[in-house]
Design a protein with these regions (language model features):
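Conserved NTP-donor binding/palm subdomain of two-metal-ion nucleotidyltransferases/polymerases, i.e.
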Residues: 13-14, 30-82, 88-313
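NTP-dependent small-molecule kinase module
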Residues: 263-287, 485, 490-547
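P-loop (Walker A) phosphate-binding loop of NTP-binding proteins
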Residues: 320
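Conserved lysine of the Walker
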Residues: 325
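Hydrophobic positions on the alpha1 helix immediately C-terminal to the Walker A/P-loop
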Residues: 328
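Short beta-strand-centered segment that lines the nucleotide-binding/catalytic pocket of NTP-utilizing
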Residues: 339-355
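ATP-dependent small-molecule kinase phosphotransfer cores
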Residues: 351-459
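A glycine- and Lys/Arg-enriched "phosphate-lid" helix/loop adjacent to the NTP-binding pocket
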Residues: 430, 435-514
Length: 547
């Protein structure tokens, strides 16, 4: 039988305590980690209800876990903590997946990037009490690398889990400071690139990463346990440098020298060959460029947003003017875009985002409304009745021509937006629609405007009417997954929108109530007169069920 390589540490060696006085970590009587001015940002308060219940289930099932903040790229200098990071024994992966599903957590995957073998598993859950989304970053391996690719996988998971400590204030297990410091030091050292050396030679000050400074402060100059750990894992030369950095401050020169000492051991834990990591990183950089170029399709405040692996979701907000539709839509976008890639699509005919073809018409309308009071009623958007006077017939012909141009431009825009909705949903994105095309009420409320011309004696007008109605008929097949109907009494809507006529509001509210969708679409009626907080909470619950 072949002997193991000299750099492979036996499992018992990795699980050996760091020092005689170091606690085993699994005892609940262990003191919580100390806090101070330098580590105030690293302290985690009591976990939310969803996370607390999840941790209780893990403890009941005797699954070893610990909170792990070993990824500097998730916690940049100016970034706020994005959820909870935990490390779990990979032998319990199936049991953990079942527990997460029972606890209400849903899987999310990174957008526009290939799977990373050393990466994390991201889960999301809805906190029912406050309506916020809880993020959970689950890892089974300890991998190091930059934000695009993990290059090394350190087999130190048994050591981390066997030396964990119970943070009684946070109510969860955390990593031993000595283990966390050594891991962070290795990560920072192997993250140094040629650019880091050039900036250092040019005199640019090197700033020690925040998380490494926090763990360094918690060690309080006690280099004994971390030096012993470094000697066992990386060798005597690396241990001497670690002792100097714990007693003093991690500097660029010492970190670079530490890298030289650790290279013979750490390079044996590479995930790829020497050239493999380089071309994979280049390919991922191209993916990032492609993602940035497609930002028009997937507008999200966070470029590292997640997608739904089970398929995207389209959500449509319907409601008359004064129902609070715009306010609720903006709030929903802000709530979702912090965790998932979201795409807002405006299907209305007002002043919202429009196509290049309809934009000049909106500008012309804006100018005409200042000069002609009759334009405020937008006569080109409705059909006119018969008239006998020559002047009236001439005016009707002009408005009919304007109506034709407007209807064609609007149909062209809706056709493109329906294509965008289909592409985004097929890619796993969440699409939030302001209004939605309908084919049940012509000449009204996002319906076709030229249906009355389908029986016109002129063949050209019949063809235009047929072409204009195509996207509205297509919308009957490309239906949203969730339709939220916002209902409000016409008098309440008029108080919110004084410029609207009461009869018009009544007509629109009746049309919203009469809209019907296929069985595959979930339709929810919402009383928009309730307090905003209650309406928002109900909308969030409905949206979360569909994701």
């Amino acid at each position: 039988m072949s002997r193991p390589a000299p750099w492979v540490k036996p499992m018992a060696e990795l699980k050996r305590p760091l020092a005689e006085e170091s606690p085993a970590g699994s005892d609940s009587s262990v003191e919580p980690l100390a806090t101070g001015p330098a580590s105030g940002g690293s302290r985690v308060g009591r976990a939310p209800g969803m996370v607390t219940r999840l941790l209780d289930r893990l403890n009941e099932q005797e699954i070893a876990y610990c909170r792990w903040q070993g990824d500097e790229h998730l916690q940049a200098e100016t970034a706020a903590p994005q959820g909870l990071d935990i490390l779990v024994d990979r032998q319990d992966a199936l049991r953990v997946a079942v527990i997460l599903a029972e606890a209400g957590f849903k899987r999310a995957v990174a957008a526009a990037l290939l799977p990373d073998p050393g990466g994390e598993h991201h889960y999301l859950a809805l906190e029912e009490d406050c309506g916020s989304i809880v993020q959970l970053h689950l890892r089974y391996n300890l991998a190091i690398g930059d934000e695009r690719l993990s290059e090394y996988r350190l087999p130190w998971e048994p050591l981390v889990l066997s030396t964990r400590r119970l943070d009684q204030q946070a109510g969860m297990y955390v990593a031993d400071p000595s283990v966390e410091f050594l891991f962070l030091l290795v990560q920072v050292a192997f993250d140094l690139r040629l650019g880091s050396l050039v900036r250092h030679r040019l005199g640019a000050p090197w700033c020690c990463p925040r998380r490494l400074r926090e763990v360094h402060w918690r060690l309080r100059g006690d280099a004994g346990p971390v030096a012993d750990l470094s000697r066992r894992l990386l060798g005597a030369a690396a241990a001497d440098l670690v002792s100097e950095m714990v007693a003093g401050e991690p500097s660029f020169t010492k970190v670079r020298e530490f890298r030289r000492c650790a290279v013979p051991v750490v390079h044996n834990y590479r995930l790829y060959r020497r050239g493999g990591a380089r071309w994979r990183r280049s390919w991922r950089a191209l993916c990032v460029v492609a993602r940035n170029l497609s930002r028009g399709l997937a507008r999200s405040r966070r470029p590292e947003g997640r997608m739904v692996p089970s398929g995207g979701v389209a959500i449509a907000f319907l409601g008359s003017d004064g129902s609070g539709k715009s306010t609720l839509l903006v709030e929903t976008m802000a709530w979702l875009s912090g965790s998932l890639r979201t795409v807002p699509i405006y299907f209305g005919s007002g002043v919202g985002p429009s196509s290049v073809l309809r934009w000049p018409l909106l500008q012309a309308e804006r100018l005409l409304r200042k000069r002609m009071p009759s334009v405020r009623d937008r006569p080109w958007r409705r059909s006119t009745g018969p008239t006998s006077s020559l002047r009236a017939r001439l005016s009707r012909s002009l408005w009919a021509a304007a109506r034709l141009v407007w209807a064609v431009a609007l149909a062209y825009e809706k056709r493109g937006k329906l294509h965008a909705l289909t592409r985004a949903r097929n890619r796993g994105l969440v699409v939030v629609c302001d209004r939605y095309p309908q084919n049940q009420f012509p000449d009204f409320n996002d319906g076709p405007m030229l249906r009355s011309w389908r029986d016109h004696p002129w063949r050209l007008l019949r063809g235009l009417a047929e072409w204009e109605g195509a996207p509205y008929r297509w919308a009957e097949h490309v239906v949203p997954d969730l339709v939220l109907k916002l209902h409000v009494r016409p008098d309440v809507a008029q108080r919110r929108k004084p410029d609207m006529q009461l009869q018009e509001l009544e007509k629109r509210a009746e049309a919203i109530r009469g809209l019907r969708f296929p069985d595959v679409t979930e339709t929810v009626d919402i009383d928009a007169e309730e307090p905003l907080e209650q309406v928002v909470r109900r909308i969030r619950r409905c949206v979360w069920r569909k994701i």
